[in-house]
Swiss-Prot record:
Protein name: Enolase
InterPro entries noted in UniProt: Enolase, Enolase-like_C_sf, Enolase-like_N, Enolase_C, Enolase_CS, Enolase_N
Localisation: Cytoplasm; Secreted; Cell surface
Cofactor or coenzyme needed: Mg(2+)
Organism: Lacticaseibacillus paracasei (strain ATCC 334 / BCRC 17002 / CCUG 31169 / CIP 107868 / KCTC 3260 / NRRL B-441) (Lactobacillus paracasei)
Gene assigned in the entry: eno
Amino acid sequence: MSIITDVLAREVLDSRGNPTVEVELYTEDGGFGRALVPSGASTGEHEAVELRDGDKDRFGGKGVLKAVGHVNNEIAKAVIGLDVTEQRLIDQTMIDLDGTPNKGKFGANAILGVSLAAARAAADEVGLPLYQYLGGPNAHVLPTPMMNVLNGGAHSTNTVDFQEFMIMPVGAKSVREAVRMGSETFHALQALLKSKGDITAVGDEGGFAPNLKDNEEAFELLVEAIKKAGYKPGDDIALAFDVAASEMYDAESKTYTTKWSNPDKKYTTEEWTDMIDGYINKYPIVSVEDPIDENDWEGWQTFTKKMGDKVQIVGDDLFVTNTDYLKKGIDMGVANSILIKLNQIGTLTETFEAIEMAKEAGYTAVVSHRSGETEDTTIADLVVATNAGQIKTGSMSRTDRIAKYNQLMRIEDQLGAQSLYKGRKSFYNVKAID
């Protein structure tokens, strides 16, 4: 038993230059943990609350001094004296102290910082890597990455409707090889864009946002880049994309619109599903995220019934890493995968519960970054600890993204012959892929 003796939070900056919370936690036997909390740009309406100050004279209202104050006062008093290895007790203590269903009193950014710092301090104290401390001796599966190399929708200023276009090195034999394949394709894509006179500046997640006219052009460009890098589309590197459909849904008329490329065009759920199905039939796509609005549960049922056997269907805004929404989805036969974002739910314990529930129901789990990231690499350890098998952590540029890939390669080296990279077999619940 090792007691927490001190907790200290401060306001620091994330990868977008916006304030975020950093927490340091100390134990009586010399254990130390530090954690930084990420932040999302496009967020689901059911996510846990990210507490901001609202003072327009500081950081345009985005300061986090209130959250920092809650850590340094109420939360610190509650967790000091607890055993640092009692993760569930630490997390539940904070949840109970907050007392709201969405962590609206203290903020999920305050609570998550303490939750992650405690886990790191416990791992430090027992002398284990974080992934091994969290996952035990069976933590050995390295994830297949989703690399966001092209951006559209709300993440760009072009007329591409879908928000993210990703490559997945499904044919790699290791994380190290997957990272190399991704890097080579990223640079091939950059060269193609330059040759076309397009913009090659990168966005929040390290991907390009060139002036493309529509989704079709984005898919064609990725296939061309994969070939240019010397790989076979589909066999070596497959495609994935995030529709972010909630950005294009009108709840009143129950229709979708191609908001950026052709805002006057309206689609019923069936027509929208058919449009996406057309892309999946034409291109080597293995995963689609948020194809339907987060509140259109009937639409999700329609989409899953038609597409569930041919592609991974990931719920992000739909599930927000929350077991209540995930259980509803499982009961309704909605989606077949969940995106896992630590700050959507706000504690490590609840994150583990969501991953476990997904696995028990035969859903895959994709551990994910946020658009506002930091140098913190916890999600790399988390995805190995849980043997989740897939990670979404940005493109092949920006240190805040690369830090996670570098950590995965370190973990793979540490595991040696015990490590397992599943590649295409990460989609174990989709008949047409595995």
